[in-house]
């Protein structure tokens, strides 16, 4: 197993292993490194969806995403983060399913709209592009750690309202039509703005701009200004690793201490096919 650093504050790559055939010692080592480095890139992994699911289940149960149009028809645990349908055709720009996925171009944390958000995500790049479509990952431990002490005191007991419907409101195309899937069936949830990781016990900012409606019990305009400040602070280059995809890269990240986004690409002409499994969270976020 060959381990290489990808960024001074976040991310490693691991080569020389086969994710479809891991012994327990290697898996336990990967799990330990994941908690330490937050993001792991596994290059050259020509795995099937079944292999992908099997690897994900070694970390725990897997989510089934509420969006019906993005689930694999064969394996519902596979979330198709793709601008291509299951017949291999590019999804038209105005289609609901693409407009929903386009919101991943915003910074976010997977499943922040759930009462118990996900522990992590594992993404397989099946057909990638070198013309955009890179994924950015931010270290939210470090972003919190570097805040001035006065700001830490200001935000440590604050809570944020997250709502899945907020994703819909960000797109005119989604807002004006009856949406597919179960978009409207999830109630808003409230999460701490600063959370403690259940395994590492470290504190981090918990931000997810595509679902964050407001700070709970806080002046709306002041709350939005504060959230915007924290977002901009967290996405400075010193906290962010940019992953430039190659076909058959597998990337996993810890949603409890990272935030991520996708760089835009020409979705009308380029096929970007990505499959994700998402690790079900095992407890509500802990206030730091």
Report the location of each language-model feature.
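Fe(II)/2-oxoglutarate oxygenase catalytic core
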Residues: 2-252, 256-288
């Amino acid at each position: 197993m060959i381990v290489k650093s990808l960024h001074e504050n976040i991310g490693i790559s691991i080569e020389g292993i086969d994710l479809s055939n891991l012994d327990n010692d290697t898996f336990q080592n990967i799990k330990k490194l994941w908690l330490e480095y937050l993001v792991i890139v596994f290059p050259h992994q020509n795995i099937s969806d079944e292999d992908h699911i099997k690897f994900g289940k070694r970390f725990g149960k897997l989510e089934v995403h509420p969006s019906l149009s993005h689930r694999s028809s064969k394996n519902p645990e596979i979330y198709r983060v793709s601008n291509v349908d299951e017949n291999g055709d590019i999804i038209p720009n105005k289609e609901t399913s693409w407009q929903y996925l386009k919101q991943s171009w915003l910074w976010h944390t997977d499943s922040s709209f759930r009462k118990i958000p996900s522990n992590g995500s594992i993404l397989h790049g099946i057909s990638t592009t070198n013309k955009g479509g890179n994924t950015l990952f931010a270290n939210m431990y470090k972003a919190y750690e570097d805040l001035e002490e006065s700001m830490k005191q200001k935000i440590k007991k604050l809570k944020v309202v997250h709502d899945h419907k907020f994703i819909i409101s960000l797109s005119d195309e989604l807002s004006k039509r009856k949406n597919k899937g179960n978009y409207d069936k999830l109630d808003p949830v409230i999460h701490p703005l600063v959370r403690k990781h259940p395994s590492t016990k470290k504190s981090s900012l918990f931000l997810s701009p595509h679902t964050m409606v407001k700070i709970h019990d806080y002046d709306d305009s002041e709350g939005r200004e504060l959230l915007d400040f924290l977002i901009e602070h967290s996405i400075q280059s010193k906290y962010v690793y940019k992953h430039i995809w190659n076909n058959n890269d597998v990337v996993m990240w810890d949603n409890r201490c990272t935030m991520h986004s996708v760089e835009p690409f020409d979705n009308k002409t380029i096929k970007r096919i990505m499959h994700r499994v998402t690790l079900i969270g095992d407890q509500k976020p802990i206030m730091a």
